[in-house]
Amino acid sequence: MHCPFCSAVDTKVIDSRLVGEGSSVRRRRQCLVCNERFTTFEVAELVMPRVVKSNDVREPFNEEKLRKGMLKALEKRPVSADDVEMALNHIKSYLRGTGEREVPSKMIGNLVMEQLKKLDKVAYIRFASVYRSFEDIKEFGEEIARLQD
């Protein structure tokens, strides 16, 4: 690593520590030429799979789209931002863990419903009604009955 002070190539690592939830490494370095110390952070570059929509169109995974969909269902519900972030992280971890380059959008929708069901039943019904295109009140009732089982 080049020294940010004198641009020398020779630096040594003095200290390394895990930060975050073990997802990154903080390294304290010292330049062997000018003796200045500096800190670097290393994070693994994790690639999300592409999303295959129902019409076979492929698009990059969009975390913001996922977040907005969940937040819309959770609007005015008593769920903390931390709980939402944990649910989003669970979904992303699962998708990365598949090892697939592409995943169907249906899988993502089902993962969202699974997480919403754990977070808030009303938000789950809201999301399911749009995701599954409920046509009438009967379909709402059937889904609510399944939740109560």
Swiss-Prot record:
GO biological process, one term: negative regulation of DNA-templated transcription
Co-factor note (free text): Binds 1 zinc ion.
Zinc finger (unnamed): 3-34
GO molecular function annotations of the record: ATP binding; DNA binding; zinc ion binding
Domain ATP-cone: start-end pairs: 49-139
InterPro entries: ATP-cone_dom, NrdR-like_N, RNR_NrdR-like
Keyword Transcription appears in the UniProt entry: yes
Top-level taxon of origin: Bacteria
Keywords on record: ATP-binding, DNA-binding, Metal-binding, Nucleotide-binding, Repressor, Transcription, Transcription regulation, Zinc, Zinc-finger
Cofactor(s), by name: Zn(2+)
Family named by the database record: Belongs to the NrdR family.
Biological role stated in the UniProt entry: Negatively regulates transcription of bacterial ribonucleotide reductase nrd genes and operons by binding to NrdR-boxes.
Family annotation (PANTHER family): TRANSCRIPTIONAL REPRESSOR NRDR
Classification via HAMAP family: NrdR (MF_00440)
UniProt protein name: Transcriptional repressor NrdR
Name of the encoding gene: nrdR
